[in-house]
A protein has these predicted regions:
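Short, conserved DNA-binding cores of transcription-related domains
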Residues: 1-90, 94
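Acidic/histidine-rich catalytic cores and adjacent linkers
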Residues: 43, 48, 54, 167-169, ...
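Short, positively charged, Gly/Tyr-enriched micro-motifs
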Residues: 50, 63-169, 207-208, 214, ...
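The DNA-recognition helices of helix-turn-helix-type DNA-binding domains
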Residues: 53, 131, 142-146, 217, ...
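Basic, low-complexity intrinsically disordered segments
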Residues: 63, 84, 140-159, 163-178, ...
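Conserved N-terminal glycine/acidic-rich loop preference
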Residues: 210-216, 245-248, 255
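Inter-helix linker motif
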Residues: 231-247
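Conserved phosphate-handling catalytic cores of large alpha/beta enzymes
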Residues: 247-267
Length: 405
């Protein structure tokens, strides 16, 4: 009897005593089976209204998983009581250590949820001998309870970006409160109708409080922000503009020059093999790499033009006065058009309509590097789980990873 009392004290099954401890041999190994019995003479709590009563309507044995003991799986046989509540009639007893209709104790569920923060669901399921779907359900309920509805009060400055859910051009949008690094909303799609759901959740008053929105040059995002938050400044950040410049100007010019230099073997080899030198920032290059870059630019005047104009374009984001920034832009635009490099001319003409959003950076020094970091973490979350079959659960995991400062 001393063993049962000791186990009961360690187990902490409030309102119940250990009646029997046994072993069962099942496929996969040995199990510890603990039978519990209700403690006599206790008032018990109605799960509906919270009223205390000693009247019991009926009971039904239920097998419930608990944490392992010395790596031996533990199963409890728990008589679940239906109380005869004076207010509600027959209702299930409320227990602090076991949720209604649950097949695992709160203690085991909390342990599973903590491990799911750092391990894939499959590994947690193998560790505790649970089904994959059981672990996923436990973690999902835990996240819903911990996160609750998102608090959108006081949101002023946000960032929006898209990320790939899976291959095949399947995207979702993440919205972040840039002031506190908190994910506010995640939803499937990256069109106007898709992001409109966030603004509907924000409500008319919340939309009026938005001061600035940082984004890439996604036309759908900009159109919806102008429709829902006409007072807000749209801010285009340096990262996406330079990345677009690299794709549409540097890569195309380099490919053209590679094709032209096929007959000149040394120059052709240099142009073809050193693409990454043109794309990296000069201050990130080592001295030998810097020398190699200078040699590359010296061999091709066209590449020199687009490289210099790219670095000059970056300085546009250093200005804090919109008037000076606009003056610099006009000078840069004239040089780009006068360069007679067609990809560069086309890029400058396409970038011109986005100038108001670029100049907004003078007022709001925002960028989406935080969101890009979040997107990288999203890739890690997705890779750990080998993909997600459930969008709602995936989006909860993203919110949990970025609760804010």
């Amino acid at each position: 009897m001393a063993n049962e009392q000791c186990i009961a004290q360690l187990g902490g099954w409030e309102g119940y005593e250990v009646a029997q401890i046994g072993q069962e041999y099942r496929e996969g190994g040995r199990w510890c089976v603990i039978r519990l019995e209700p403690s006599q003479g206790l008032e018990r709590c109605c799960s509906s209204c919270g009223q205390l009563t000693t009247s019991i309507h009926d009971r039904e044995d239920r097998r419930v998983r608990d944490l392992p003991i010395f790596e031996v799986p533990v199963e409890l046989i728990v008589p679940r009581l239906r109380l005869l509540c004076a207010r509600c009639g027959p209702k299930l007893e409320s227990l602090g250590w076991l949720e209604p209709y649950a097949r695992s104790t709160r203690r085991l569920a909390d342990s599973v949820a903590r491990l799911c923060k750092v391990l894939p669901i499959g590994q947690v399921a193998d560790l505790y001998g649970l089904a994959w779907s059981t672990v996923k359900s436990i973690d999902c309920r835990y996240l819903e309870r911990e996160l609750g509805p998102v608090d959108l009060r006081g949101v002023r400055i946000i960032g929006m970006d898209e990320f790939a859910i899976r291959k095949g051009h399947c995207y979702a949008t993440v919205v972040v409160d840039l002031s506190c690094k908190r994910v506010l909303w995640v939803g499937r799609g990256h069109g106007r109708e898709d992001v409109r759901r966030f603004f509907e959740l924000l409500g008319p008053e919340g939309c009026q409080q938005i001061q600035a929105v940082a984004m890439d040059m996604n036309g759908a995002y900009a159109q919806e922000v102008r429709a829902q938050c006409p007072q807000a400044d749209i801010v285009y950040d340096l990262f996406h503009v330079v990345a677009k410049y690299a794709r549409e100007v540097i890569d195309r010019v380099r490919n053209q020059e590679v094709a032209r230099a096929r007959e000149q073997h040394p120059q052709h080899r240099l142009l073809k093999s050193d693409r990454w030198l043109l794309l990296r920032n000069a201050h990130n290059l080592s001295p030998p790499q810097h020398i190699r870059l200078q040699e590359l630019l010296a061999t091709n005047r066209t590449l020199m033009k687009v490289y210099v104009l790219r670095d000059d374009l970056k300085t546009l984001w250093d200005y804090r006065h919109a008037g000076y920034a606009e003056q610099f832009w006009r000078q840069w635009y004239r040089r780009a058009i006068a360069s007679r490099v067609k990809p560069l001319q086309l890029f400058a003409k396409r970038l011109k309509p986005y100038l108001p959003g670029i100049l907004s950076h003078c007022r709001f020094q925002l960028h989406t590097s935080l969101i890009e970091g979040i997107n990288n973490k999203i890739k890690v979350i997705k890779r750990m789980a080998y993909g997600f079959r459930d969008d709602d659960y995936f989006f909860l995991k993203i919110r949990a990873a970025f609760p804010g400062n």
